[in-house]
Amino acid sequence: DYHWTEVVMRDIPHSMLEGVALHHYSVIDWGKKGPAKEFSEQHYFQTMQRALLMDELISKHSNIMDKYDPGKNVALVVDEWGGWYDVEPGTNPGFLYQQNTMRDAILAGATLNIFHNHSDRVRMANLAQTVNVLQAVILTDEEKMLLTPTYHVMEMYNVHQDAILLPLNLKTNDYVFGNEKLPAVSASASRDTQGLTHISLVNIDSKNAQEVAIELRGGKYTSVTGRILNSEKLQDHN
């Protein structure tokens, strides 16, 4: 609600505001959210449409905040985000227990890239629940537990913590589904306290590999290492 943000930033003394909250879940239809595991490419594409909408939401709320807080003293806090699907069959619908697949890994990586690229205003973002609920990093069953694809994305992205955002220009192919399209690649970059540059790339296209060329400026680089999180199908899970 952009009007809500406008009124809050205009009428409440900023000395009383540490942050303004933004919630956004990647839900296709609140009445029929779709399965967490056995989903179609259409479900995947629509989920990613909703996920990438995060960039527009942050941009528009940030523009309003910039009018009243050009010094960016008040943070935009995205304290609820992630994929939200139908619960696993046989589980309590009130517990929101859902499986976590490679779709969720891609959603998480693309969303974290958006947060990184808006880090001048987004200074906190978190999953509302981390275990057994929605975009969980850990799933448990009695004494058993597993780490989800989302966990592995979070672990890979922790190199960006306490680092400095590096601006980037991204030219990408389109991921086309029917008559609609999304950018095929999502990216963000940072330099850590040791002077190492970290670049995170996400291939959103469910059908095609992406060849990526990276031009680095303003530094001397002597070696490169990389890690890839991948699986055969979007529906794969632990």
Where on the chain are the PLM-derived regions?
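Aromatic/acidic polysaccharide-binding cleft in carbohydrate-active enzymes
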Residues: 24, 73-187, 193-196
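Active-site-proximal structural segments of metal-dependent nucleotidyl cyclase/transferase enzymes
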Residues: 61
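Flexible loop/turn segments at secondary-structure boundaries
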Residues: 1-4, 26-32, 82-88, 131-137, ...
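Carbohydrate-binding surface patches
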Residues: 182-220, 226
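Acidic, Ser/Thr/Pro-rich beta/coil linker or hinge segments at domain junctions
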Residues: 220-238
